[in-house]
Amino acid sequence: CIRDSTYINDISADSRYLLFSTSDRVYTSLPHSRNSLYKLDLQTMAIDTIWEKAPYVNQAAFSPDGKQLLVAGAGDAFDGIGRNIKQGQISNSYDGQLFLYDLASRKASPLTKDFNPNVIDAVWNRFNGQIYILCEDEDYQRIYTCDPANGKIKQVAASEDIIMSYALADNAPVLFYYGQSASNANRLYAYDLKGGKNRLVYDLSQDKLKDIALGEVHDWNFKSDDGTTIQGRYYLPPHFDPNKKYPMIVYYYGGTSPTNRALEMRYSMHMYAALGYVVYTLNPSGTTGFGQEFAARHVNAWGLKTADEIIQGTKLFCKEHSFVNEKKIGCIGASYGGFMTQYLQTRTDIFAAAISHAGISALSSYWGEGYWGYGYCSVANAGTYPWNAPEFFTKQSPLFNADKINTPLLLLHGNADTNVPIGESIQMFAALKILGKTVEFVQVDGENHGIVGYQKRIGWQNTIYAWFAKWLKDEPEWWKALYPDRTL
């Protein structure tokens, strides 16, 4: 195996012990990363090995008295004692769990096995002995408290939908956090742990949004064909008129992370709405934050259930909302969402325009390419490889179904992408050109998986807006101005 790195995990309350871990890469079995944990006595420099090359554990922290550890990992950690999935399912190890580990007995016990939210971070507070957990809770990001004595978990009544970060005092009953919601930017609060009261410390949102009009945001859920409730929401344009017909944009990730309610994000749904679109987003099967069973649906799926839910949700939304022009629906996603964009077009013709940013077109090439390919696929298609399931790798790849695509498709990609290499878009572009389909391909020079250069980001955003204007509003002028016809 190859040792990747060493990490400091925690320092004990009395400052005597240092908890550190090492990460080792193992190619020949799952998971490909194994962690070892050590306790270093800073007085004697003696090292106590807690565990070696353990799978599915991430990091650990001391309890206030130093007798236990709070361990973050996946449900499969510690021989699966935290696993809570159906028979026949494979765990999605991106779904985070917490465990208590007794240093004397060297035994672990699950804390969050029956707790649906996905654990992002946790702190064992020295002041009151409670554990504070930041987690994805459906499309919210919330803080919960857990009593380690009895395992009871309660929600902290924070004032924002998305808690971005938090900090606890060691010697006072106070928690500071900042966050945002679907229609406001970040605000900073102090929370009284005893009284349960929030006090606004600073409102950055007021300054940011003082000259901006936002449309309304509404929740909208539906039951899929198998009876699962699929959660979503929609954004209306400012000055919305229910008697008009609006084009609609459907946004999704479709992978293992939820599309949360944050105002500020790379794919701003309020921004699309401000341009005169209704925007519908949803969190289909496989998303974390909805319980381990729901998250496990992501494994070895690659669009199988997800596409059905996106198509069904889009059709039902149009049926129930007469203000949507069902002939003018666009869709957009990035990375796994870019894969979903491409895959959806092989399954349906309900979209009038589609955009794939950094999308995966062939599982067989992505699996072995990029910095994340085989590592991400060790979860997304655990145990499934090109040599033991060649039909799966072709059947679920948009490239191998390119002849079924009829929707005008825009492919966007940074040409320095180390996650999903640009070849994924190049080969889909080549296929669709050979097939005589409507496709455009825009490379962003020097950009990686996300477009972060300021001027390049503006150009990238305008490209998206212009593509939708061309196909959903019958206004091609913006696109022509950006990309005039050329004769070689």
Q: Model features per residue range: what roles?
A:
Residues 253-269, 284, 423-424:
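The serine-hydrolase catalytic nucleophile loop
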Residues 244-254:
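Short beta-strand element of the alpha/beta-hydrolase
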Residues 13-14, 64-65, 126-128, 170-171:
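Residue-level detector of Asp-centered blade-edge/turn motifs that repeat once per structural unit
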Residues 274, 281-488:
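Active-site-proximal cap/loop segments of hydrolase catalytic domains
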Residues 3-6, 21-37, 51-61, 71-99, ...:
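A flexible loop/linker signature enriched in serine peptidases of the S9 family
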Residues 41-45, 102-106, 147-151, 193-196:
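Short loop/turn segments that connect beta-strands within beta-propeller blades
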Residues 3, 7-10, 15, 19-22, ...:
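Non-catalytic accessory segments flanking enzyme active sites
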